[in-house]
């Protein structure tokens, strides 16, 4: 009993001595009394157990254990994801899974759909969804770190002898495009962050009275989105300029992602199953009317598109599929060396190259005018039968960024449309209250402020084609100038072959074929 008491007194004395330098003078006078006071061992241990020194240890251990549990759960999740990829999405292990390239492409697409599918408003992403996106896309993109190629490198030995050896490096297209796509990804997410704290427009519930009143012709086809509201007088000039600036920035990002996606798709091999399903000539694929328009002596791609019925997405996609099929047919006829093939035709090679160039021009215009168009039959076939994992990652990553850019631009257009309606309504009310305008002017202004549903939809489609769809390439619409005038007659020459990226940059030169140098 005596040793235990002495041990308790010594521990208490040392504890009070350590705290003596931090105590006030009044407390210093009480410490000798505290040091001489004897306490039972149980009370001494209880008092020591409540000290900050002892309580900090279990708290630290709990934090460490939680962190370890979180890391372990993330590791298990990553193992499950990669197990599913290795099995080709066939968890039964029966060998019925898809290729690794297609499985990885589907994984990136499904991840983006689960993360960005809930982005229905112009507002920053939720922190948990943002963290999940960054973490899981890093997992999927880490596969490309191990897709390497051999490149020559010089190594200097200790004796000063320079020797050339082969070293591994990430494949060239991945080394260039993966960092670029990551940058585009960050720019799109930062665009959403730029709308933090803006209170000049807001969203209301679809089922509320205010939400029903906020519905218009533009939002009737987007019933799943919450209607946007703006002040009665519309947005301020600074807010309107900010929206246009963000829209231009997103359009440039989408243009870059679209160019990367088109380049990757062009490098993918065309599957044999798609080639076997094609007709023998381009006339059958296009149809008589389209073939006649493309093969005429005078050809203007804008005028050609204006004559087509592109009122629905299905019709636009059908035209795109027909044109892509004809391009594949003409290219095969140009490069096929087998004279016994049944692909022979009486059309000369120069004309076939000219027709191919015109068809590719139409494709570029369709992709720019309808950026949200679904994938064509050729693109789906390439993605489905692709075996290159690197191409699969680049194609899927660029495609989802292109889709995210289109979504953000659509949300910005919704706000700008609501602002235009509010300003038109405000202008109409001021005009009717003034009473100083003639009757004819009143009727004209009333007609302009009370558009019918079809007129509003037509007006918005025209404005959208001027600002949203053609803005990707910095090309203004000049279709209103001289539509009835024929282009000047030029000698029949074989056009210069341009790549898809060159067409995006030099779209203004598509009115007439150029000389092939």
From Swiss-Prot:
Name the residue ranges with Basic and acidic residues bias: 66-76
Q: What is its main location?
A: membrane
MF (Gene Ontology): guanyl-nucleotide exchange factor activity
**Region: Disordered, residue numbers:** 16-76, 428-517
What residue stretches are annotated with the PRONE domain?
65-429
Compositional bias per record (Polar residues), positions renumbered to this chain: 39-63, 440-452
- Keyword check for Membrane: yes
What are the GO BP annotations of this UniProt entry?
Answer: regulation of pollen tube growth
Has the keyword Protein transport been applied to this entry? no
Q: Which UniProt keywords apply?
A: Cell membrane, Guanine-nucleotide releasing factor, Membrane
Classification via InterPro entries = PRONE_dom, RopGEF
Q: Which cellular component appears as one GO term in the record? A: plasma membrane
What Pfam families does the database record attribute to this sequence? PRONE
Q: Name the tissues where it is expressed.
A: Expressed in pollen grains and pollen tubes.
**UniProt subcellular location:** Cell membrane
The annotated subunit structure for this chain is:
Interacts with ARAC11/ROP1 and ARAC10/ROP11. Interacts with PRK6.
What does this gene product do? Guanine-nucleotide exchange factor (GEF) that acts as an activator of Rop (Rho of plants) GTPases by promoting the exchange of GDP for GTP.
Record's comment describing the protein's domains: The PRONE (plant-specific Rop nucleotide exchanger) domain is responsible for the GEF activity.
- Could you tell me what this protein is called? Rop guanine nucleotide exchange factor 9
